[in-house]
């Protein structure tokens, strides 16, 4: 769905202003993005447009996005990172 150039832009957008987000978002992109459905990929790209404080709150489980696509994607990101810890 995305061209190589578009994926490079998405990869760049995964670089956040907070190290705490970098260590969860970038590995998810690198290891899971290609396996996502087209809709999930769009949700992921849309999620990257959110502000870091909001994304951090959602990833830490202190809140939940009202956008169902974003909430679902955060769940996938968190689950992916938890699977690496176990």
From Swiss-Prot:
It comes from Vibrio vulnificus (strain CMCP6). Gene3D superfamilies: Flavinator of succinate dehydrogenase. The keyword DNA-binding does not apply. Keywords: Chaperone, Cytoplasm. One of its GO terms (cellular component) is cytoplasm. It holds the Pfam family Sdh5. Its main location: cytoplasm. The gene is sdhE. It is found in: Cytoplasm. This is FAD assembly factor SdhE. An FAD assembly protein, which accelerates covalent attachment of the cofactor into other proteins. Plays an essential role in the assembly of succinate dehydrogenase (SDH, respiratory complex II), an enzyme complex that is a component of both the tricarboxylic acid cycle and the electron transport chain, and which couples the oxidation of succinate to fumarate with the reduction of ubiquinone (coenzyme Q) to ubiquinol. Required for flavinylation (covalent attachment of FAD) of the flavoprotein subunit SdhA of SDH and other flavinylated proteins as well. One of its GO terms (biological process) is succinate metabolic process. It comes from the Bacteria.
């Amino acid at each position: 769905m995305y061209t190589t150039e578009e994926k490079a832009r998405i990869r760049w957008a995964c670089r956040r202003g907070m190290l705490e987000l970098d260590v969860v978002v970038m590995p998810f992109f690198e290891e899971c993005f290609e396996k996502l459905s087209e809709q999930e990929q769009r949700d992921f790209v849309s999620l990257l447009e959110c502000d870091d404080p909001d994304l951090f709150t959602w990833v830490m489980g202190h809140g939940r996005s009202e956008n169902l696509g974003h909430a679902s994607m955060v769940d996938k990101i968190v689950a992916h990172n938890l699977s690496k810890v176990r």
